[in-house]
């Protein structure tokens, strides 16, 4: 089934960036579209459909150039879609695009745990695409994990991402099933109080944490 975004007859999605002087915080309309794209993404069954949603999120980000949350989501979806591309050049192009949006978000919202964590994820994905980057980017990823946790120790996504990474690390390096399970348990606990005034605030990961806990309990 093709995923889609429902709109009112009088509404149209943002088609192009507004003039620089008009690009302020999100309008009610752009925020509404962002929420619809986020909701629709999880119903998509194909990569083509997910990339269609990505283009919509990017249009919202371009129309709300001073809104860090819109920039964040554009970076996030570029990053996670990169994992679906086996071609190295295509994956790297998406990660480069993701990083540009995340850097924009960081320039708008200093020292935000969600943004720092997303940059760590992007760097981790770069290592996945190009393992030879591990020596260079590996320490950066660990430092970004630590910074994200220090900025907001209640952010469940920090513990989820760290926990999942520990699943693939040897025990002698601090990883393994036991260490990963401890982090995922903490993530699930933090998700219980993960509430924000802005409905577009990053909220992903709870289902993934639940899936990982099921796997770790086997």
Per-segment meaning from a language model:
Residues 74, 81, 119, 126, ...:
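Structural register within alpha-helical repeat arrays
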């Amino acid at each position: 089934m093709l995923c889609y975004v429902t709109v009112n007859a009088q509404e149209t999605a943002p088609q192009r960036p507004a003039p620089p002087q008009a690009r302020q915080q999100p309008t009610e309309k752009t925020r509404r579209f962002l929420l619809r794209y986020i909701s629709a993404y999880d119903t998509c069954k194909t990569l083509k459909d997910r990339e269609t949603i990505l283009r919509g999120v990017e249009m919202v980000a371009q129309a709300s150039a001073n809104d860090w949350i819109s920039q964040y989501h554009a970076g996030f979806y570029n990053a996670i879609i990169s994992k679906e591309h086996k071609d190295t050049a295509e994956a790297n192009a998406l990660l480069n695009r993701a990083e540009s949006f995340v850097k924009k978000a960081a320039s708008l919202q200093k020292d935000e745990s969600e943004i720092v964590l997303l940059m760590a994820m992007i760097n981790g994905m770069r290592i996945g695409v190009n393992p030879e980057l591990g020596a260079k980017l590996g320490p950066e990823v660990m430092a970004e994990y630590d910074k994200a946790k220090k900025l907001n120790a209640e952010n469940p996504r920090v513990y989820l991402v760290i926990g999942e990474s520990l699943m693939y690390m040897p025990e002698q390096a601090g990883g393994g099933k036991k260490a990963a399970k401890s982090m995922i348990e903490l993530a699930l606990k933090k998700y219980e109080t993960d509430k924000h005034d802005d409905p577009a605030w990053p909220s992903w990961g709870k289902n993934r944490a639940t899936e990982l806990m099921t796997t770790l309990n086997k």
